[in-house]
Design a protein with these regions (language model features):
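Conserved C-terminal beta-signal and adjacent last beta-strands/turns
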Residues: 20, 237-239, 276, 323, ...
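Extracytoplasmic beta-strand/coil segments of soluble accessory domains associated
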Residues: 57, 72, 89-136
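Short acidic/polar hinge/loop motifs at secondary-structure boundaries
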Residues: 135-164
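Transmembrane beta-barrel wall of Gram-negative outer-membrane proteins
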Residues: 221-297, 318-333
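Face-selective signature of the C-terminal outer-membrane beta-barrel domain
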Residues: 276, 280-282, 319-511, 594, ...
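Structural signature of Gram-negative outer-membrane beta-barrels, strongest in the C-terminal barrel
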Residues: 278, 413, 428, 432-436, ...
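Membrane-embedded beta-barrel scaffold of Gram-negative outer-membrane proteins
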Residues: 331, 342-363, 539, 545-555, ...
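Gram-negative outer-membrane beta-barrel transporters
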Residues: 423, 488-495, 504, 598-601, ...
């Protein structure tokens, strides 16, 4: 144990020197070994580099997708940018099995669930490994799995690759829902520049249009000025000769979300570089600075929602954050995998320093009063503290309430990691084996600070400020993994067994300021986990693949409390066993069809916001996913998908009945997991003629439950006021909705390397009115979804 701590400290200080020494040694060794046959070797290595290209596939037509032994969807650049997507959340709506609850329209903090899991917790996406260019972007990829900050902006993205089965060996924990890899724009061969502007107009007036009747007679600029979102983008990139390439991107987002008084500001700067030493050795590096601030109006009571679903009754709901990310990758290619032996070696080092601050009042969980200062009709008995009997008579943000409190929850995540990885191909002709082996060592430093402000006029509240408590975590993880892809008869049969084994070391320390009489404590925990997986593929003919995969995945113990509320903190492992079987068929490059069945068995799954229960449950989610691509003629493309999900609780877990908190608890065995739409339809199409593209996209979600008791009618329960926190629970099924988007894109002018491109898109064409149940912004009440919006875009390439 003591040796691990010394090693951990050494790595944090000496990693850059270790990286340079390791890379130089490996490069020198390979250069020496290959020097005698350099004139033959370089030609072979070029082929090897192509076969081990680490870039994600470009579209569903790519060989990586055709031969994938799991369900896989690629959102190509054309689908991403020309079918009416407003942000990355919109784009992910095009993937079967992924469900999005977009409550802001800005794309700042996506709410993602996959195959029935992820709607709980504190609302921030905590299901599925989220990567940017293959690097994890969770603040703490092991002990704080949530997108508390999402350092990605829409205009910087090139495409998105989604794999939903058999990935635990390569990617580690939290892969039971799949892996989402966001690919940013790559460095082009020739130098290019781009300047672009994107403006979104929200139709958020009381009648859903762009000009509110109540503001009739006012100048148009005044009525529209407070409901616009500006998205400015600039980029310069290219190769400086044969060996060195650089890319610099900047993205600035400023304006309003679709709710009233919801200012949003984002800055995103990206620097990428590549150094091609020779045909066998390459360095890549990146640096990113990302910062955001936003307000989240959260939920409304049913009465306020009916009055005006766009009002903001929670001005205290706000968050902000900053991310600094850096990484460097060295890659070496050797041999010829088509003949005997070949492959590539990759060494990756990455680090990030992320911080975020969530601020909200203790009315975070309440919908106890309407904006018209009327007490709401409640069901049930509720529970009122004798010391504060009238707290429920105050509005959401009234600081005069004797119960009013405001919480600041500051977190900082510092991660350092390195990973050597080897792909080795041994080809004997009839049998081809690809050995994939590697090791990842990762450290997490977490710094937590929570403060509270109270009403100073209330006795015993003192000055009204409580410094709270601080807690630091210093964790490290070592994972080793290996897999062997055995390929028979030129790909007719492929079997890939694999195993990943991880050592997890946790250390928690109390940090100042200490409360009177507090004795600082240090707690250390040591765990280990294994992830077996197997993928099988069979091709009766060249373009028809049958596949099956199994994986064991897990979520480690989590540290993610939010103030005094239920976060996602756990002291146990959540275990998932995932099986998937399906088939993928291609016909003449015109048709691609994938059908698969999946089942996920969850043990000790943390339900979080599903109720006041902190106890985990067992659950089973199973379903069918169908996906079709069809290109009948040149320029015309169709994409359709359907997902059925049946997610049930399989343990006898007792939960509190919100209608009678002190009464007997209820068994939720057999109940459906909340926030899961059993039926999901996807339909999008595009047609390109000359220099103009017309794109259409749509998504349908069936109704969902919002509580583990599966309440059908919308119900507002009597408030519970305890220890200064006010809770008014609600329950009831959300409505179904089918949203349609339309975009027209065209090249307006073109001359040599210069061009002007523009587009006009309408999202939620029919102004579908629907709501969610406050996932991540306030867990009770109705949270409005984005209304109709119009987005204008213009870009100059030169």
């Amino acid at each position: 144990m003591r040796k691990v701590i010394i090693m951990n400290s050494y790595l944090r200080v000496k990693t850059p020197y270790f990286l340079a020494l390791y890379t130089l040694t490996f490069w020198t060794f390979n250069s020496f070994m290959g020097a005698k046959e350099q004139h033959h070797f370089l030609k072979k290595v070029t082929t090897t580099e192509q076969k081990f290209n680490s870039s994600a596939p470009l579209s569903y037509q790519s060989e990586e997708v055709r031969n994938s032994t799991s369900s896989r969807t690629v959102i190509s650049n054309k689908e991403l940018k020309k079918t009416g997507n407003l942000n990355i959340e919109n784009a992910l709506q095009n993937v079967p099995g992924i469900q999005i609850r977009d409550a802001t329209g800005t794309g700042v903090l996506p709410k993602i669930s996959v195959r029935g899991f992820g709607g709980g917790g504190n609302g921030h996406s905590n299901t599925g490994m989220i990567l940017v260019n293959g690097i994890p972007v969770y603040g703490a990829p092991y002990s704080n799995i949530e997108l508390a900050i999402f350092p990605v902006t829409f205009q910087s993205v090139d495409r998105i690759d989604v794999i939903k089965g058999g990935t635990s060996v390569q990617y580690g924990p939290n892969t039971f829902g799949g892996v989402v890899n966001v690919i940013t724009k790559e460095i082009p061969k020739e130098w290019e520049n781009q300047a672009a502007e994107r403006i979104t107009f929200w139709g958020r007036s009381s009648n859903g249009n762009f000009v509110d009747p109540k503001e009739k007679g006012k100048p148009l600029a005044q009525t529209l000025g407070n409901q616009m979102l500006f998205n400015t983008y600039g980029r310069t990139a290219g190769m400086l000769g044969k060996y060195i390439g650089i890319s610099a991107q900047g993205n600035w987002i400023n304006g309003q979300g679709f709710r009233q008084n919801s200012p949003t500001k984002v800055q995103n700067y990206l620097l990428d570089a590549i150094y091609k030493i020779n045909a066998t050795n390459t360095f890549k590096a990146y640096y990113q600075y990302y910062q955001y601030n936003s307000y989240h109006p959260g939920t409304l009571s049913a009465q306020d929602y009916a009055y005006n679903r766009f009002i903001n009754e929670r001005p205290d709901n706000q968050d902000g954050g900053r991310a600094k990310r850096f990484g460097i990758v060295y890659q070496n290619y050797f041999g010829d995998p088509d003949r005997k032996v070949g492959g590539d070696f990759k060494f990756t080092y990455f680090t990030h320093d992320m911080s975020r601050d969530f601020g909200f009042s203790n009315q975070y969980q309440s919908v106890y009063m309407s904006s018209q200062n009327k007490i709401l009709p409640f069901k049930g008995k509720g529970e009122i503290s004798a010391t504060n009997p009238n707290c429920g008579l105050y509005s959401y943000s009234d600081t005069n309430s004797p119960c009013w409190q405001f919480f600041d929850n500051i977190r900082r995540f510092v991660v350092n990691a390195f990973e050597p990885k080897l792909n080795l191909v041994v080809n004997t002709g009839k049998v081809k084996q690809t050995f994939n082996m590697g090791m990842r060592f990762l450290t997490e430093d977490l710094y937590r600070r929570s403060t509270t402000r109270k009403n100073p006029s209330v006795p015993n509240n003192g000055s009204g400020f409580d410094a709270g408590t601080s807690l630091n975590n210093f964790n490290n993880y070592t994972a080793v993994y290996a897999s062997d892809e055995i390929n028979f008869n030129n790909g007719m049969l492929t079997i890939t067994p694999g195993l990943r084994y991880t050592f997890l070391n946790y250390e928690k320390k109390d940090a100042p300021p200490f409360k009177e009489g507090q004795v600082p404590k240090t707690i250390k925990d040591r765990y280990n986990q294994y992830n077996p997986a197997v993928n099988v593929g069979y091709k009766p003919i060249k373009d028809w693949l049958f596949y099956f995969n199994y994986q064991r995945s897990y979520i480690p113990p989590q540290f993610s409390n939010i103030g005094n509320f239920v976060g996602t903190s756990t002291d146990y492992f959540q275990i998932f066993n995932v099986m998937e079987g399906g088939s993928r068929y291609y016909f003449n490059n015109q048709v691609s069809f994938n059908a698969n069945y999946f089942v996920i068995f969850a043990n000790n799954y943390f339900t979080g916001r599903y109720g006041d229960n902190k106890e985990p449950v067992n659950a089973r989610s199973q379903g069918v996913e169908l996906e079709l691509y069809y290109t009948p003629i040149r320029g015309l493309n169709f994409h359709a998908a359907y997902t059925f999900i049946d997610a049930n609780i399989t343990s006898h877990t007792m939960v509190t009945n919100p209608a009678n908190p002190k009464g007997p608890k209820k068994d939720i065995f057999g109940k459906k997991l909340p926030f899961v739409s059993p039926h999901q339809f996807i339909l999008d199409a595009s047609y390109t003629y000359a220099k103009t593209t017309i794109g259409l996209s749509s998504f349908f979600y069936s109704r969902t439950y919002t509580d583990v008791l599966n309440t059908v009618p919308f119900t507002q329960y009597a408030p519970t006021i305890k220890n200064g926190a006010i809770t008014t629970k609600t329950a009831g099924m959300t409505p179904w909705y089918w949203v349609w988007n339309l975009q027209i894109s065209s090249t307006l002018w073109e001359r040599k390397k210069q061009s002007v491109n523009a587009s006009l898109q309408v999202n939620n064409i029919f102004n579908m009115k629907y709501w969610f149940s406050g996932i991540g912004t306030s867990p009770n009440g109705k949270e409005a979804a984005p209304p109709r919006s119009i987005t204008a875009y213009v870009s100059y390439h030169f």
